[in-house]
Curated annotation (Swiss-Prot):
Matching Pfam families: RNase_PH (PF01138), RNase_PH_C (PF03725)
Record gene name: rph
Protein name (Swiss-Prot/TrEMBL): Ribonuclease PH
Organism: Burkholderia ambifaria (strain ATCC BAA-244 / DSM 16087 / CCUG 44356 / LMG 19182 / AMMD)
UniProt cross-references to InterPro entries, sorted A to Z: ExoRNase_PH_dom1, ExoRNase_PH_dom2, ExoRNase_PH_dom2_sf, PNPase/RNase_PH_dom_sf, Ribosomal_Su5_D2-typ_SF, RNase_PH, RNase_PH_bac-type, RNase_PH_CS
EC numbers, comma separated: 2.7.7.56
GO MF term (any one): 3'-5'-RNA exonuclease activity
Membrane-spanning residues: none
Alphabetized UniProt keyword annotations: Nucleotidyltransferase, RNA-binding, rRNA processing, Transferase, tRNA processing, tRNA-binding
Positions annotated to bind phosphate: 91, 129-131
């Protein structure tokens, strides 16, 4: 590894971008958060519906599902809305399924009861790491939605069992890096997205060699970086939620 590598962002190899979680960002949703990872900005909302999908009818449990999308000019050039095209891209479907899986990993769906939490993640500005930012922000939005259910007497206890957060890591010019922005992500040798719980359990690891295969040692270094970064994100979630969080 090259210790003298200069990242395009000027950050250390193990340094997150500036991360902010702004709660109660919109008026109507039971939970809403603006999550910012540097120049990546995503609005995450959590909406509660007192019903479940047909496949869960009469099974005594709830459900959590997610949708993901990007504003037409969230990136350097404008993209048509997927609604105008008539279908979602494979990337969109993959990301929203990932967000749903990540949050369900820390929900006791039986304790949630026969209701659904709908997570919506809308990228208003993209500079790399939109899916991981979405997961990190969506957890806080879902937590606030659950708090409202408890306050309304609809839940006796929280169905949330742990925190969950996510981060990107990658190998850039031979050096493992934490929290890739677009300039790094578009040129990295290896790209990996990692989702973990507050207790340190892995929910998902998505890793791809963009050109040169990566070694087991590099994979271990990337996972160590991800674990460190996610630990910082979980602490930020706890800080913004304050007393009464998981």
């Amino acid at each position: 590894m090259t210790s003298s590598l200069s990242r395009p962002s000027g950050r250390r190899a193990d340094e997150l971008r500036k991360v902010a979680l702004t709660r109660h960002y919109t008026k109507h949703a039971e939970g809403s958060v603006l999550v910012e990872f540097g120049d990546t900005k995503v609005i995450c909302t959590a909406s509660v519906a007192e019903r479940v999908p047909e496949f869960l009818r009469d099974r005594g449990q709830g459900w959590l599902t997610a949708e993901y999308g990007m504003l037409p000019r969230a990136t350097h050039t404008r993209s048509d809305r997927e609604a105008a095209r008539g279908k979602q891209t494979g990337r969109t479907q993959e990301i929203q399924r990932l967000i749903g899986r990540a949050l369900r990993a820390v929900f006791d769906l039986e304790a949630l009861g026969p209701r659904t939490i709908h997570i919506d993640c809308d990228v208003i500005q993209a500079d790399g790491g939109t899916r991981t930012a979405s997961i990190t922000g969506a957890f806080v939005a879902a937590h606030d939605a659950v708090s409202k259910l408890i306050a309304a007497g609809k839940l006796a206890r929280s169905p949330i069992t742990d925190h969950v957060a996510a981060i990107s890591v990658g190998v850039y010019e031979g050096v493992p890096l934490l929290d890739l922005d677009y300039a790094e992500d578009s040129r990295c040798d290896t790209d990996m997205n990692v989702v973990m719980t507050g207790a340190g359990g892995f929910v998902e690891v998505q890793g791809t060699a963009e050109g040169v295969p990566f070694s087991r040692a590099e994979m271990n270094a990337l996972l160590d970086l991800a674990q460190s970064g996610i630990g910082q994100l979980v602490q930020l979630q706890k800080d913004v939620l304050g007393a009464g969080n998981v």
